[in-house]
Amino acid sequence: MSGASVKVAVRVRPFNSRETSKESKCIIQMQGNSTSIINPKNPKEAPKSFSFDYSYWSHTSPEDPCFASQNRVYNDIGKEMLLHAFEGYNVCIFAYGQTGAGKSYTMMGKQEESQAGIIPQLCEELFEKINDNCNEEMSYSVEVSYMEIYCERVRDLLNPKNKGNLRVREHPLLGPYVEDLSKLAVTSYTDIADLMDAGNKARTVAATNMNETSSRSHAVFTIVFTQKKHDNETNLSTEKVSKISLVDLAGSERADSTGAKGTRLKEGANINKSLTTLGKVISALAEVDNCTSKSKKKKKTDFIPYRDSVLTWLLRENLGGNSRTAMVAALSPADINYDETLSTLRYADRAKQIKCNAVINEDPNAKLVRELKEEVTRLKDLLRAQGLGDIIDIDPLIDDYSGSGSKYLKDFQNNKHRYLLASENQRPGHFSTASMGSLTSSPSSCSLSSQVGLTSVTSIQERIMSTPGGEEAIERLKESEKIIAELNETWEEKLRKTEAIRMEREALLAEMGVAIREDGGTLGVFSPKKTPHLVNLNEDPLMSECLLYYIKDGITRVGQADAERRQDIVLSGAHIKEEHCIFRSERSNSGEVIVTLEPCERSETYVNGKRVSQPVQLRSGNRIIMGKNHVFRFNHPEQARAEREKTPSAETPSEPVDWTFAQRELLEKQGIDMKQEMEKRLQEMEILYKKEKEEADLLLEQQRLDYESKLQALQKQVETRSLAAETTEEEEEEEEVPWTQHEFELAQWAFRKWKSHQFTSLRDLLWGNAVYLKEANAISVELKKKVQFQFVLLTDTLYSPLPPELLPTEMEKTHEDRPFPRTVVAVEVQDLKNGATHYWSLEKLKQRLDLMREMYDRAGEMASSAQDESETTVTGSDPFYDRFHWFKLVGSSPIFHGCVNERLADRTPSPTFSTADSDITELADEQQDEMEDFDDEAFVDDAGSDAGTEEGSDLFSDGHDPFYDRSPWFILVGRAFVYLSNLLYPVPLIHRVAIVSEKGEVRGFLRVAVQAIAADEEAPDYGSGIRQSGTAKISFDNEYFNQSDFSSVAMTRSGLSLEELRIVEGQGQSSEVITPPEEISRINDLDLKSSTLLDGKMVMEGFSEEIGNHLKLGSAFTFRVTVLQASGILPEYADIFCQFNFLHRHDEAFSTEPLKNNGRGSPLAFYHVQNIAVEITESFVDYIKTKPIVFEVFGHYQQHPLHLQGQELNSPPQPCRRFFPPPMPLSKPVPATKLNTMSKTSLGQSMSKYDLLVWFEISELEPTGEYIPAVVDHTAGLPCQGTFLLHQGIQRRITVTIIHEKGSELHWKDVRELVVGRIRNKPEVDEAAVDAILSLNIISAKYLKSSHNSSRTFYRFEAVWDSSLHNSLLLNRVTPYGEKIYMTLSAYLELDHCIQPAVITKDVCMVFYSRDAKISPPRSLRSLFGSGYSKSPDSNRVTGIYELSLCKMSDTGSPGMQRRRRKILDTSVAYVRGEENLAGWRPRGDSLILEHQWELEKLELLHEVEKTRHFLLLRERLGDSIPKSLSDSLSPSLSSGTLSTSTSISSQISTTTFESAITPSESSGYDSGDIESLVDREKELATKCLQLLTHTFNREFSQVHGSVSDCKLSDISPIGRDPSESSFSSATLTPSSTCPSLVDSRSNSLDQKTPEANSRASSPCPEFEQFQIVPAVETPYLARAGKNEFLNLVPDIEEIRPSSVVSKKGYLHFKEPLYSNWAKHFVVVRRPYVFIYNSDKDPVERGIINLSTAQVEYSEDQQAMVKTPNTFAVCTKHRGVLLQALNDKDMNDWLYAFNPLLAGTIRSKLSRRCPSQSKY
């Protein structure tokens, strides 16, 4: 029967009086063995269910069929436990629950026989079974002990001699036991009942004297049940000993629920310590049992804390040991006790998982005899089964065996103590009392007490005391003597000892004044019939009426035992005087006994709640309180009997006269009303709080006024000084020398460029109008309009020409006032109901918003009519909707940026912008009759009119129905552009051009043929599908072109100056691109010369040699444009048609017939032929040389919402999809507590930048006294992330290490403060939450020593973190499964020469485990990282990447600065009624500008591709004989700037402009006539690159011994250009050959580099220190700046979140200049950073390289120089390092990951080599 689980039963009691008075509700439900509890605070929450062995419903009355009585509880639990006891097992029953839950009632019950508890019934049945035994061989003995555990002290309740606290000892064989605990022999149930009563009396007396209650102490009643059996065959006696432990645990109440204070609170803490330890033991045992099946090996964590409390120490065998254990959990059904009841249920649920390994406690000899008998029986059965039963009785072997067996058993009996000791040594902790009893039969075991004399014992003690450790030895000797003396006692001696103790106990009680029965005993329940007496009352019902004191005739004195005169009733405790009071019992004349109470002087005596100082006559039932703790009820039997006879109907008290009644009566009579006292105290606290709050508010208001006055004074000073400075500047400007023409040109160029930037203005528009957008969306959602509004940026290009209504009024001017394509902020209106998209201007949005508000106000009145109309129409009198498009634009091709955009916009505006009178609408009107079979209507008209009527279409213009715009049925699919330069020669060309949408998406392809023809030539026969029109005559007027400024210079890239590039803002404004005055001069000169090309006949003179005879001025010329096919158009568009026109024409375009688009992949065959006749003019020649024809493709939208009956979209608008993933939220710094509030200083120019690599560690205190870094879980696999796995309740420290490159500007001075706060269980920060901010104590801050050659700085500081000071439950408890705790940490660090501290902020993720839990990384992590990093503290850290910028303070007096700092309120945060319905939708912000910039760059690239394709097609047709001038005008994309290594399109365009301006003769492309000059140029560039490679390479890497031809760098490289902007030739060989760390000649350009270009990447960590940095030869800002200027630096630290996209990862070999060996490291490229690890198993970032500031170099000469293949170099400002890949392919992949443009350039160069020289 070993391995059985603990039996667990729960029992719910009825409501008590307190719960009934509070009208409590029952929250416990039971069904079978399942128990459920309902949370009264959250009734909707599902009930928590628990399953136990027994669930007893005792909440109702016994009449309930489900009611569980005392007998049922005993029959289920008590009988089973008693049966186990007779079998020889140890048995334990303990009750648990809060105070008043019914534990004692279940265990002890009441005096009524039907309500007896488990203990009385078990004891009674025990003796019934003993008495019913008829086996003469069996004999029984029962011994009991009764002890109390209070505040970790043990008291003997049965022996009055043991007045002190007993010691708990542990014996190697017996285990834990209580020294000197009385073990009394009993022979009947009456003896046990008397001993229980005696123990309760002793417990009551002690508790009353010490102001205790039984509910605050643990009581353990132990019965040692011994069964002896005499075996007649062997003449041996065997024993089975069972120990029955009956435990009544203390209440598990919480301090706040019982109102405990002071001493009571301390006592409760000690009691809860025992219960807490018991809970730990139960949890540990349950966990061990659960893990047994998984792993049989005992772990170090399988420690059971038995010794943490006396209770668990003594009950060790009963909890998971050699015992059969049952637990009864008592529950309160009331909702006010929900927390305690739930805790009890969880306690019991854990207990049922414990398994006990119980064994039968019998002697080894008895076990051996039994096993031998079983073996003999088995052998006899076997012989009989084999047919040899007749020889069993006569076989001599068997007789000999039997004889030898008996002999052996006798020998074992004589020496059984040896076998016993050997057996117990093999099985420690399972020693039985019966086995110890067998020790007495051995002579050797008795020698210590009987055969050894006193002298020998004394000599032994002296010898032991003289040796080291003698005291311990003598203690163990005495302990053994006591045990042996106890075991040697016979049964008769034990009975005599029990009787003597009983006499002493009763004498002691009698001496104390406790009443004596007629038989002389004080025990048992009795009530005197005549004598007046006092009965004690106690808070514990079991202690009430337990003590009875007689009031004898005459005087009965009450006082302390040490009084001068003997006291009849002895009391002790606080406030009891030596002579406290006197009871006088006198008989009156009538024979009635009158008892009078006379209090002594200064004694506290109360009668019925009133303090008495004079004699008082007592009546039966009076309550008497002596001192503070002794409460009695006076009983006068005769007086009570007489009163009942006089008044039979006397009223009985409405409630029992108990201890609670007496205490409440005392408070009432003393005038103490607890409720009033609490209310009075609460009012006092409220008054005090209001007073202090008023004082604080007054002080705060006074301080605010003081600060405001100071700020106003300072502001006046600043304004006065700024005004004076501006006046001085103006005066100085007037006195300056007048500008020269060149200076005016430079100023004009700069002003035009500055004027073209719009970033700030666009942002102001987005911020300022966000509130209108939000309000429009909110009204749309509330009115269920299914219309969404969002910001969009539109640029006036040929892809998306803007109609006049979207242009602001100030932009509608001539081209001279607006020379650049402008970007406007518009509103994208998505009509989800009609499937249309419109674009409104901001003014139109505001106008419509007024109408929306009016409609919203009239929504109730229009509800009925609007509902009908909205179901039958798709448009109507609704400001939300514009007319939707039936044909949609698919795509378009790129175009130039001149004013033609505006002309094209006026001629053929995009359908999405078109008005009701647009050309596209007219086209739809013309084709309406032909498409009547397709649809009945050509337009969707307003709701209030008939379809297609003029009235309905004019509603908006007339103002009757201003809510709808008419939209065409055809939607623009896209645009394509075809150039006509082949007409110059003439040669026919067939173009396949991309159809590109306004967003830059390719929507299909269009095949167009352009050729020159004779005037009378007929169109070819294309088949039945041909659609042919006649010859159209078009004029190209020179005057018109001049007025319209359609010049070739304005439309060609070669003639554009820098400011005429398309710029939103920041484009072309890169800090790395600096245009020196010489370059500007050249550009302006070229621009001025080009601007005169149209004057006179310069155009024709310049191109006269290249134009054929067919293009003579004034002659007629005819050419043909054939629209062949369209392919790749999405099937959602039907009825596709195409129209085309010239850029300058405003009349009707040339259009094809619509074709059905079945979407099967077959091209749409238009085969539309259009002959065009023109008169040749200079404008026409210029047009065909530089300008295209625009083709617009339109389509019909198949999935029309009328066919789908509208879209039922009731969800709020969602945020639009972005082009890049949104950045992770970054927490704001935690405010400092010791520093003054830092103002957000306006930052000026950044002087230098540093990349910081920061390590965060949390260390915990280990048992060794050292702080070890806590384990970090890196399973997420992303950089700069990790979860700290911490222990609960352990001291911690936070360590932060900052790593960066050395720099003279950056020096950490001190750590001003480290603050932590924002404790939460989710990553997002709740700004509204009020959280305590904790400032940590900095214990160390210092620089760490690194290697001698290290160019990195390591700064580390450490702080003490006590998480309990946060007073946060999240930090104090064990984190539930699946939950994580987040905390924000901010470090304020002081830097030299900075006016304010720098702030490093990090969000830390943590999980808390129990204090004793063994934490290790997850299994998958260990298998992934291996043993090297899963166990090393080196991996227990979380990294962070930061960018530190040291900036100047901004110039407050500059008007430009004041303009840029103008305060534009971000209205997106303003509340709008109904915005809560938008479900997270937000207006677009600054990111929209960047996305639009990307769109423009994408369109620019598409445009360049189309132009290049046309140029290559024409060159192929002409056989590479295309003139140079035409290549200049048509193909700037093939100039040297195309292969530049610049990273943005703007810098590419700038480079192209510079190259064409400086060396216009060198950008001629691949003309066969210039091969020789090209070869010479290549030779010159190769010489330059060779000189750069050999002369400027770092001296640390190699020493160059070869000689190179002497050529000056100034003669080759462009002067004053930024080194990062290299020419075509240099980019081909060494794109970044001017890297500062690898070029010695970089000093020529240092002063021209911006500070942003000087920022660099941080170096790796100390773990691979060989990653050194080579300092650059550069003058730092510290040396260049003045002292006062340098002190004005402001640090700005921004956390960088690495990208989750991995470009490449793998191993690379690193070599530093100062090291001779190569080091292998694992590298991961997450642009723009390169992360360096020690290996692929390393979870911690050891170093980073910022690719945005680093330069990558590669050349074959470099590899030959270092004599190592597959190498390339990476250099930053302070470092240069060589990297080696595995092979050529791997190196090429790494180069592509590091610098894609460089890799592409190298591939392009190598592909042009001959195959014999190709390496790839």
UniProtKB/Swiss-Prot annotation:
EC number: 5.6.1.3
InterPro entries per UniProt: FHA_dom (IPR000253), Kinesin-like (IPR022164), Kinesin-like_KIF1-typ (IPR022140), Kinesin_assoc (IPR032405), Kinesin_motor_CS (IPR019821), Kinesin_motor_dom (IPR001752), Kinesin_motor_dom_sf (IPR036961), P-loop_NTPase (IPR027417)
In-chain residues carrying the UniProt-annotated modification N-acetylserine: 2
Cellular localisation: Cytoplasm, Cytoskeleton
UniProt superkingdom: Eukaryota
Tissue: Isoform 3 is abundant in the skeletal muscle. It is also expressed in fetal brain, lung and kidney, and adult heart, placenta, testis, ovary and small intestine. Isoform 2 is abundant in the brain and also expressed in fetal heart, lung, liver and kidney, and adult skeletal muscle, placenta, liver, kidney, heart, spleen, thymus, prostate, testis, ovary, small intestine, colon and pancreas.
All residue ranges annotated as the PH domain in the record: 1702-1799
Keyword list, A-Z: Acetylation, Apoptosis, ATP-binding, Charcot-Marie-Tooth disease, Coiled coil, Cytoplasm, Cytoplasmic vesicle, Cytoskeleton, Disease variant, Isomerase, Membrane, Microtubule, Mitochondrion, Motor protein, Neurodegeneration, Neuropathy, Nucleotide-binding, Phosphoprotein, Synapse
Single annotated GO MF: ATP hydrolysis activity
Native organism: Homo sapiens (Human)
Biased composition (Polar residues): 1554-1566, 1640-1658
A GO cellular component entry from the record: dendrite
UniProt disease link: Charcot-Marie-Tooth disease, axonal, type 2A1: A dominant axonal form of Charcot-Marie-Tooth disease, a disorder of the peripheral nervous system, characterized by progressive weakness and atrophy, initially of the peroneal muscles and later of the distal muscles of the arms. Charcot-Marie-Tooth disease is classified in two main groups on the basis of electrophysiologic properties and histopathology: primary peripheral demyelinating neuropathies (designated CMT1 when they are dominantly inherited) and primary peripheral axonal neuropathies (CMT2). Neuroblastoma 1: A common neoplasm of early childhood arising from embryonic cells that form the primitive neural crest and give rise to the adrenal medulla and the sympathetic nervous system.
Binding sites annotated in the UniProt record for ATP: 97-104
Family statement: Belongs to the TRAFAC class myosin-kinesin ATPase superfamily. Kinesin family. Unc-104 subfamily.
Gene: KIF1B
Record's subunit section: Monomer. Interacts with KIFBP; positively regulates KIF1B microtubule motor activity. Interacts (via C-terminus end of the kinesin-motor domain) with CHP1; the interaction occurs in a calcium-dependent manner.
Spans annotated as Disordered: 431-450, 1550-1570, 1617-1660
Record field: compositional bias (Low complexity): 432-450, 1621-1634
Gene Ontology BP terms: anterograde synaptic vesicle transport; apoptotic process; apoptotic process involved in development; mitochondrion transport along microtubule; neuromuscular synaptic transmission; neuron-neuron synaptic transmission; retrograde neuronal dense core vesicle transport; vesicle-mediated transport
Protein name from the UniProt record: Kinesin-like protein KIF1B
Modified residues (Phosphoserine): 1054, 1057, 1416, 1454, 1487, 1573, 1603, 1610, 1613
Region (Interaction with KIFBP) residue spans: 270-350
